[in-house]
């Protein structure tokens, strides 16, 4: 009987804590308007920043392809900025 009481007590405590966590999540989470505003500020929504990210990714892929073709350690090449 003691085991059943412990299981029920533990289950109720777990459910209570989960309920409090869910309520706090709802209180802290941003509203619909705030989520839309945040979505507009993503880099993907800004064309100049998106173009810059594409350019940076192309440069990284170029270096990776170049390093795959040679046995040289690209990390030790100087200068790094070129």
Curated annotation (Swiss-Prot):
Keywords: ATP synthesis, Membrane, Mitochondrion, Mitochondrion inner membrane, Transmembrane, Transmembrane helix. Residues 1-6 are mitochondrial matrix. Belongs to the UQCC3 family. Associates with the ubiquinol-cytochrome c reductase complex (mitochondrial respiratory chain complex III or cytochrome b-c1 complex). One of its GO terms (molecular function) is cardiolipin binding. It is found in: Mitochondrion inner membrane. GO terms for biological process: ATP biosynthetic process; cristae formation; mitochondrial electron transport, ubiquinol to cytochrome c; mitochondrial respiratory chain complex III assembly. Pfam families: UQCC3. One of its GO terms (cellular component) is mitochondrial inner membrane. InterPro entries: UQCC3. It comes from Xenopus laevis. This is Ubiquinol-cytochrome-c reductase complex assembly factor 3. It is a single-pass membrane protein. Residues 30-82 are mitochondrial intermembrane. The chain crosses the membrane at residues 7-29. Required for the assembly of the ubiquinol-cytochrome c reductase complex (mitochondrial respiratory chain complex III or cytochrome b-c1 complex), mediating cytochrome b recruitment and probably stabilization within the complex. Thereby, plays an important role in ATP production by mitochondria. Cardiolipin-binding protein, it may also control the cardiolipin composition of mitochondria membranes and their morphology.
């Amino acid at each position: 009987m003691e085991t059943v009481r412990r299981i029920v007590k533990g289950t109720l405590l777990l459910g209570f804590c989960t309920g409090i966590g869910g309520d706090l999540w709802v209180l802290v989470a941003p509203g619909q308007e705030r989520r839309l505003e945040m979505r507009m500020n993503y880099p993907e929504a800004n064309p100049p920043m998106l173009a810059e990210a594409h350019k940076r990714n192309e440069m990284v892929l170029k270096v990776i392809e170049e390093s795959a073709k040679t046995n040289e350690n690209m990390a030790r090449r100087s200068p790094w900025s070129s």
